[in-house]
Amino acid sequence: AYRAGLAIRETLARRDSANTQWQRDLSVSHNKIGDVLLVQGDGPAALDAYRAGLAIAETLARRDPANTQWQRDLSVSHNRIGDVLRAQGDGPTALVAYRAGLAIAETLARRDPANTDWQRDLTVSHNKIGDVLLAQGDGPAALATYRAGLAIRETLARCDPANTEWQRDLFVSHTKIGNVLRAQGDGPAALAAYRAGLAIAETLAPRDPANTEWQRDLSVSHGKIG
């Protein structure tokens, strides 16, 4: 179905290259196909699809730098490519992609600090970069990046304590930071981070006993604290 849609959108995009909506639709189609290919385990083909979408997103973003939707599309495209590269073990190239996405996310977040979606996007970029840096053995840089994301997530969580997604984001940040600190041999600081995460997990888990993700988070927290 996605390929049939892609064929139609390619025809439309060729027919009128100045029609930005059709161009964006085509980029979305490439990304959806990439998502399917990735789930099927075909990383190289997914990467090709994502790069086709990225090329269109770059063209649109250059055409109108003030169009925040197109800028966000471009940031997401970079992150998708980074995800595939990282899964393939190509950390350095993944880092380049993630940093390209981060640069856009930072610009958007500065443009409208009240836009919580853009603020959250920025935290996601920080965490992706931190994950790669940690895998490369650069604990201090990973920690700094994770903490940059944590600061934003703390602000979001305070703004809306009822937003469970933001609360869980905060749990994830505390846990990532705890992992780095533990690896660095800083047990007391790691324990403080883990306990901050546990407090959130203990709040979320009773709220919805059927939510297996939250139940697992609680189990993981207890395991890390020991």
Q: What is each stretch, according to the model?
A:
Residues 1-226:
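Thr-biased low-complexity repeat/linker tracts and other Thr-enriched repetitive architectures
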